[in-house]
Amino acid sequence: MTDEELHKLAHDLRTPLTVVEGFARMLERGEGRLSPEDRAEFLTRILEAARQMGDIIDGITRPRA
């Protein structure tokens, strides 16, 4: 993998990771003050970002033809 490819991969992973971190922090700070709907939305966003990271990892570990 070239340096350019590694840089793109790091960026592609960092984006959803930032989403996970941000929403997790909001859940942590809003404990007891967030509505059930907000909590559900934050958890949905975290799960979507985690799936996105999983898809990226699957894409780079899949054997190439």
Features from the language model and the residues they span:
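Short alpha-helical segment of the dimerization/phosphotransfer core of two-component systems
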Residues: 48-53
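Conserved C-terminal segment of the DHp
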Residues: 23-34
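DHp/HisKA histidine-phosphotransfer helix
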Residues: 5, 38-43
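Short alpha-helical N-box/ATP-lid segment at the N-terminus of the HATPase_c
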Residues: 54-65
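A conserved signal-transducing helical linker
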Residues: 1-7
